[in-house]
Amino acid sequence: MNSSFSAPAKKSLGQHFLADRYYIDRIVQAVDPRAGQHLVEIGPGQGAITFPLLRKHGALTVIEFDRDLIAPLTEAAAPIGALSIIHRDVLSVDFTALADGTPIRLVGNLPYNISSPILFHALDHAAVVADMHFMLQKEVVDRMAAGPGSKVYGRLSVMLQAYCDVTALFVVPPGAFRPPPKVDSAVVRLVPRDPATVHINDRRRFADVVRAGFGQRRKTLRNALSTVCEPAHFEAAQVRPDARAEQLEVADFIRLANVEPA
């Protein structure tokens, strides 16, 4: 039974609504909601994932910016379960306050135009997030899960993998959406690491080091990091200054960032 409704996609909001039952079911199976968990969906759209999750779990919080979707979501959800709708820009939502002591599980078909800001916003609240299941452009998922030496290994890869276990799950073709996007999508799972195991002394400095390293990725680290690292830092962190950012493991960036400035 599918309770999703029809609504026009708004290009300005980067909307592409999932419509293929096979992929909807695969996402719900990947999330596998259990009793007592606090599920939060970002951008429910026409309810393709919303209503199967609600039917399986009984309660769901959704964050939707498009006011035209609020009434139909509310109406369609009424006979299924308890749907709580937050009508706001997701980047303004305080996930820590929303969790209210219970870890939240984030789910969503993220708008292509703001997927990276949403990822970093969720990362800021990783301490209260149990896991995340997101659908994004495949190229973004490839970057998220990439390892050292890959052409797509970069700032996004390091920043996310420093704080989360990242697993690309499966590809979703354009034909599964209405309207179809021009590129493949993919579903990814992120599980925040135990804060006690994330040995980053200063998150801002870590971000600065990673940003500088990949900002000039063709340069050696000695040159790319000249504004944030001194020569002695490389020796202290046991990192070769003649290497390039794409050759470093996540742990190498963490060690570099953790070296105390002279």
From Swiss-Prot:
Endpoints of the signal sequence: none
The EC number(s) this enzyme carries: 2.1.1.182
Leading EC class: transferase
Keyword NAD attributed: no
Localisation per UniProt entry: Cytoplasm
Family annotation (InterPro entries): KsgA/Erm, rRNA_Ade_diMease-like_C, rRNA_Ade_Mease_Trfase_CS, rRNA_Ade_methylase_Trfase_N, rRNA_adenine_dimethylase, SAM-dependent_MTases_sf
Record-linked Gene3D superfamilies: Ribosomal RNA adenine dimethylase-like, domain 2, Vaccinia Virus protein VP39
UniProt xrefs under Pfam families: RrnaAD
Record field: catalytic activity: adenosine(1518)/adenosine(1519) in 16S rRNA + 4 S-adenosyl-L-methionine = N(6)-dimethyladenosine(1518)/N(6)-dimethyladenosine(1519) in 16S rRNA + 4 S-adenosyl-L-homocysteine + 4 H(+)
Binding site for S-adenosyl-L-methionine: H16, L18, G43, E64, D89, N109
Source superkingdom: Bacteria
SUPFAM superfamilies: S-adenosyl-L-methionine-dependent methyltransferases
Keywords: Cytoplasm, Methyltransferase, RNA-binding, rRNA processing, S-adenosyl-L-methionine, Transferase
One GO term describing the cellular component: cytosol
A GO molecular-function descriptor: 16S rRNA (adenine(1518)-N(6)/adenine(1519)-N(6))-dimethyltransferase activity
Alphabetized NCBIfam families for the sequence: ksgA (TIGR00755)
Family, similarity comment: Belongs to the class I-like SAM-binding methyltransferase superfamily. rRNA adenine N(6)-methyltransferase family. RsmA subfamily.
Record function comment: Specifically dimethylates two adjacent adenosines (A1518 and A1519) in the loop of a conserved hairpin near the 3'-end of 16S rRNA in the 30S particle. May play a critical role in biogenesis of 30S subunits.
Annotated protein name in UniProt: Ribosomal RNA small subunit methyltransferase A
Organism expressing this protein natively: Xanthomonas oryzae pv. oryzae (strain KACC10331 / KXO85)
